[in-house]
Amino acid sequence: MAADLGQIPDVDIDSDGVFKYVLIRVHLAEPSGDPAKECKEIVRGYKWAEYHADIYDKVSGELQRNGYDCECLGGGRISHQSQDRKIHVYGYSMGYGRAQHSVSTEKIKAKYPDYEVTWADDGY
């Protein structure tokens, strides 16, 4: 059976660079196949990903093996400058559309409280 949703980190992003990210909604898998009411959104962004789907496929596969269901809410890009303590969220995913960057930014701010975290809908 799946563990508590609270054990899944809200944010996991690479420490430096510009890279793609996705916003994913995670919920417990119900035996009936219907999504559970309890859910949370998580942010995942990595330099190794050529496509947004690469991130979603890897993360959702891991979560599904642990008893969760996932849906991708959209994507974009993250510019992470750890030396300057700045993170900027922007752009969109050709495959998944634009993530709600305001939601992603709030999650990132909680993990990086001493950073300047901004977002914009411009760019690709």
UniProtKB/Swiss-Prot annotation:
Pfam families: Ocnus. Keywords: Cytoplasm, Hydrolase, Protein phosphatase. InterPro entries: Janus (IPR007702), Janus_sf (IPR038596). The keyword Cytoplasm applies. One of its GO terms (biological process) is negative regulation of T cell receptor signaling pathway. GO terms for cellular component: cytosol; leading edge of lamellipodium; nuclear body; plasma membrane. The keyword Cytoplasm applies. The active site is at 52 (proton acceptor). Belongs to the janus family. Exhibits phosphohistidine phosphatase activity. PANTHER family: 14 KDA PHOSPHOHISTIDINE PHOSPHATASE, JANUS-A/JANUS-B. Monomer. This is 14 kDa phosphohistidine phosphatase. It comes from Mus musculus (Mouse).
